[in-house]
From Swiss-Prot:
Species of provenance: Botryotinia fuckeliana (strain B05.10)
Gene name of this polypeptide: AA9B
Disulphide bridges, residue numbers: C56-C173
Signal sequence segment: 1-17
One GO CC annotation: extracellular region
Keywords assigned: Carbohydrate metabolism, Cellulose degradation, Copper, Disulfide bond, Glycoprotein, Metal-binding, Monooxygenase, Oxidoreductase, Polysaccharide degradation, Secreted, Signal
Biotechnological exploitation: Lignocellulose is the most abundant polymeric composite on Earth and is a recalcitrant but promising renewable substrate for industrial biotechnology applications. Together with cellobiose dehydrogenases (CDHs) an enzymatic system capable of oxidative cellulose cleavage is formed, which increases the efficiency of cellulases and put LPMOs at focus of biofuel research.
Protein name: AA9 family lytic polysaccharide monooxygenase B
Residues binding Cu(2+), per UniProt: H18, H87, Y170
Molecular function terms, GO-annotated: metal ion binding; monooxygenase activity
Residues binding O2, per UniProt: H159, Q168
Subcellular location(s) of the protein: Secreted
Keyword presence, Secreted: yes
Cofactor annotation: Cu(2+)
Length: 322
């Protein structure tokens, strides 16, 4: 019989392995901790891909959202930071819009993928992020239409993907007002909910612990979109110019959160100089009382996996339940 202390310790491990998207930076500047993000009521995963929660997490479809919207320009470097987790899997990013008012957008409907980061040399993106302060940087596409958007950050945990419905979805949505240069749309797009299926081979992986080759893995959601007649898709850490963040921390205070956040940001080699020189990285709402913080510039590349992470998945992770 298990002792109460052992059971309690197991439950604590399961909960602390869960995660939320809690901060982002635009060209190295953040509007604040949990600012412009629709925060869910807990850090538990979404399990039902057919539910509305697959869009922006629990309560993420409630409008008006009561969340401020942060300004950005097409092509800007976006850094997201998540809570630490040992769960293996990819990270992807989508946009919903343009809309007139992001705070009134439910997120139910058409999304287009702007970034995906899967693995490097047999190490999952999530494990690489864990070695780099759980931060990851990509660029918004060019050729976008101006307007307000929902930015959906998705971490798919595959440690229980050997059973149908076992994959865990960690999702957070931020509100952005993006200035673009085109009136054209971005595509291809997918429907959420609708285009994710629990039995898709990218979601249900029976052999995840038995010889599965993650270098052959293709995440759900289709191809990364392109925008405008002469625009481009986003540039993420899966490309040759992308980089992952280092484990450099700085305290970030917020009037809406009493906790402390570690921050780190990177830019791709093609935009590094503009990131450092940008004077219009972000325009927080005047109602935002959080401190706007600059992120450190120390970088590590994501072209090789850390030596400490040698396996695709850790068997012990599948004990974590929602």
């Amino acid at each position: 019989m298990f002792s109460k202390s052992i059971i309690a310790a197991s439950l604590l491990t399961a909960v602390t392995a869960h995660q939320n998207f809690h901060q982002f930076w635009v060209n190295g500047v953040s509007p604040g901790y949990q600012v412009s993000i629709r925060m869910p009521p807990s850090n538990s995963p979404v399990l039902d891909v057919a539910s509305d929660n697959i869009t922006c997490n629990v309560n993420g479809n409630v409008v008006p959202s009561g969340v401020n919207t942060t300004a950005a320009n097409e092509g800007d470097a976006i850094t997201v930071q998540w809570d630490s987790s040992t769960h293996p899997g990819p990270i992807q990013h989508y946009l919903f819009g343009p809309v007139d008012d992001a705070s009134m957008a439910t997120g139910i409907g058409s999304w287009f993928k702007i970034d995906e980061y899967i693995e490097v040399n047999g190490t999952w993106a999530s494990n690489l992020m864990d070695a780099g302060n759980m931060s990851y940087t990509f660029n918004l596409p060019t050729g976008m239409a101006s307007g307000e958007y929902l930015l959906r950050s998705e971490m798919l945990a595959l440690h229980s993907a050997q059973t149908v419905g076992g994959a865990q979805w960690y999702i957070g949505c931020a509100q952005l007002s993006i200035t673009g240069t085109s009136g054209d749309s971005c595509g291809p797009s997918i429907e959420l909910p609708g285009d994710y299926n629990a039995t898709d081979p990218s979601i249900y992986i029976p052999d995840i612990y038995y010889g599965f080759d993650i270098s052959t893995y293709t995440p759900p959601g289709g191809a990364v979109a392109t925008c405008g007649a002469s625009g481009s898709g986003a540039t993420g850490a899966a490309s040759a110019t992308a980089v992952a963040t280092s484990a450099v921390s700085s305290a970030v205070a917020s009037s809406s959160a009493a906790g402390v956040s570690s921050s780190a940001v990177v830019a791709s080699s093609s935009v590094a100089s503009s990131v450092l020189a940008s004077s219009s990285a972000v325009l927080p709402s005047s109602s935002v009382a959080a401190i706007v913080t600059s992120a450190p510039s120390t970088l590590i590349t994501a072209t090789s996996a850390p030596a400490a992470t040698s396996s695709a998945v850790e068997v012990g992770d599948d004990e974590c339940e929602a």
